[in-house]
Regions:
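Membrane interface segments of multi-pass transport proteins and intramembrane proteases
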Residues: 99-110, 137-153, 233-246, 265-275, ...
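Divalent-cation
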Residues: 1-88
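Juxtamembrane "helix exit" motif at the C-terminal ends of alpha-helical transmembrane segments
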Residues: 82-83, 123-146, 221-246, 260
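Hydrophobic alpha-helical segments characteristic of transmembrane helices
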Residues: 90-142, 146, 150-172
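Transmembrane alpha-helical segments and their cytosolic interface motifs
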Residues: 111-129, 206-231
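Polar-ligand-bearing catalytic/cofactor-coordination segments
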Residues: 2-19, 23-25, 95, 145, ...
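Cytosolic juxtamembrane amphipathic/interface segments immediately preceding
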Residues: 5-13, 18-19, 52-59, 100-116, ...
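Hydrophobic alpha-helical membrane-embedded segments
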Residues: 60-82, 153-178, 252-268
């Protein structure tokens, strides 16, 4: 009897990010922002310029993960600012002293780049504070007698903080809508990968959890950091808190790089092993994705259509 051929599942490299009442989609050639503003759909399409295309060394394994992560953060912050401009909190509100200082001292043409840099540094500082400094100080209160036990305690604290942070975010009304757009983004990508026409009817029943999601990536970063710390700290002066913090900062680059390569591997294969490996990150998406309404799906479809390459297969994962 002839063996039945297993149909190869298409996986796209197109990915996205939920915005304020909108979605950012990134394809192999360009990125598109689509926002459902009060006056209707607003779109912004840009050619995708990657720094690793200019400097090939930045495309090497491990290094490319760090570069991609930082590039995604910068582009994501810019896209969030773009979408936020259509939904001011209070038009009648007086500008803050900080806003007035910026207007006076910062040239208009440099304003956005400075604001993006400030937002990026603030985001990185928040991540380091919540998921590195806080767990390190709290774990020190347990006075563990071995590096392994200390790392396990610290790792458990990191995971609890991560889950708690996502849970609290998901309870906010405005964030709940952002997470609905996140679900719409995932559903649209699944529909496209299945080879179905991009219609609301086809997108709606698709899963809202996707194995190549940024939530999964961040969770795996935490897990990899725990594993790497368990291998490194038994051989150094791990009881000195400042040594621990310094070493962790140095390990951030390989941790992010290894996580990126892990996600690429898991995203490229669909079998029992990769499904088990991706299961914890998929579960985390219960906090960061919600079922979207049809209007949100329409936004995701429009964003997807704008970045699908003309050359078939160019966006193969």
């Amino acid at each position: 009897m002839a063996k039945r051929e297993k149909k190869e599942t298409f996986r796209t490299s197109i990915g996205g990010q939920a915005l304020i009442e909108g979605i950012l989609m990134r394809g192999p050639e360009k990125q598109a922002i689509v926002v459902r503003a009060p006056e209707g759909l607003v779109t912004k399409v840009e050619e995708l310029k990657l720094v690793r295309d200019k400097y090939p060394i930045l495309g090497l394994p491990i290094i490319r993960g760090v570069v991609t992560f930082l590039d995604s953060m910068v582009k994501g912050i810019k896209a969030l600012m773009f979408s936020a401009d259509y939904f001011p909190d209070d038009e009648a509100a007086q500008p803050s002293k900080f806003d007035l200082w910026l207007e006076k001292h910062v040239p208009a043409e440099k304003f956005q780049s400075i604001l993006v840099t400030f937002s990026l540094l603030l985001s990185l500082a928040l991540c380091l504070g919540l998921f590195m400094l806080l767990p390190t100080f709290v774990a020190g209160l347990f006075h563990a007698q071995s590096a392994l036990v200390h790392n396990l305690i610290e790792g458990a604290i990191k995971i609890l903080i991560f889950i708690g942070y996502l849970f609290l975010c998901s309870r906010q009304k405005d964030v709940h809508r952002v997470f609905q757009y996140h679900g719409a983004e995932h559903k649209t990508i699944f529909c496209y990968e299945a080879g179905l026409p991009l219609t609301v009817e086809n997108v709606r029943p698709q899963p809202k959890h996707h194995p190549r999601c940024g939530t999964s990536f961040l969770f795996v970063v935490i897990i990899v950091s725990i594993l790497v710390s368990s291998l490194v700290f038994p051989y150094i002066n791990w009881q000195n808190i400042w040594v621990r913090i310094g070493v962790k900062l140095l390990l951030l680059i390989p941790v992010v790089g290894v996580t990126y390569e892990f996600n690429r591997f898991v995203g490229a294969h669909d079998n029992a092993v990769t499904r088990i490996l991706s299961a914890p990150g998929m579960w985390m998406q219960n906090f960061t994705t919600n079922e979207p309404d049809d209007s949100m799906i329409e936004v995701a479809i429009e964003a997807m259509k704008l970045v699908i390459p003309a050359e078939k297969g160019k966006d193969q994962w």
